[in-house]
Amino acid sequence: MAKHITSSEYDAVIATAYCYVEAMEKGSSKRAKEGFHPDGGIYGYVDGEFKGGSISNLFDFLDQSPEGHKIKAHLDVIAMTPTTAIVKTEVEMNPPETDYTDFLGMVKIDGKWQIVSKIFHSYPR
């Protein structure tokens, strides 16, 4: 079988990653839940301290965040197969004055791309 991934598949992966970016902008988990698998995980560093666990931790953080974050984001698909993808996001968020680098691990399940892992590092300004 030849390795071939269509541009529409890349677009679908980026659209799934934008569920996360838009959730950060809105301060609501509703949009994030459209992109993340319910059993997903999150691991990374906040203020130099390792944090990790269920993706529900991110949902709680989003729901406790005030609405109206100004976000600048750059997304790159750094690796992709027909059923897996890794997306790197560079996010600048105000307020709070924090930047993030995220690596979103995705799997295509029943024809739909879902984020199953978020590995991140935060950079307070």
From Swiss-Prot:
Known pathway: Secondary metabolite biosynthesis
UniProt keyword Nucleotide-binding present: no
Swiss-Prot/TrEMBL catalytic activity: (2S)-3-(4-methoxyphenyl)-2-[(3S)-3-(methylamino)-8-oxo-1-azaspiro[4.5]decan-1-yl]propanal = (1S,3S,6S,7S,8R)-7-hydroxy-6-[(4-methoxyphenyl)methyl]-3-(methylamino)-5-azatricyclo[6.3.1.0(1,5)]dodecan-9-one
UniProt keyword terms in alphabetical order: Isomerase
InterPro entries found in the cross-reference section: NTF2-like_dom_sf, Put_lumazine-bd
EC assignment: 5.5.1.-
Pfam families found in the cross-reference section: Lumazine_bd_2 (PF12893)
Free-text function comment from the UniProt entry: Aldolase; part of the gene cluster that mediates the biosynthesis of the alkaloid (-)-FR901483, a potent immunosuppressant that shows efficacy in animal models and a probable inhibitor of purine nucleotide biosynthesis by targeting phosphoribosylpyrophosphate amidotransferase (PPAT). Within the pathway, FrzH is a new kind of aldolase with no similarities to known aldolases, and which catalyzes the intramolecular aldol condensation via formation of a C9-C3' bond to yield an aza-tricyclic product.
The name this protein goes by in its record: Aldolase FrzH
The species this protein was found in: Cladobotryum sp
Gene name per UniProt: FrzH
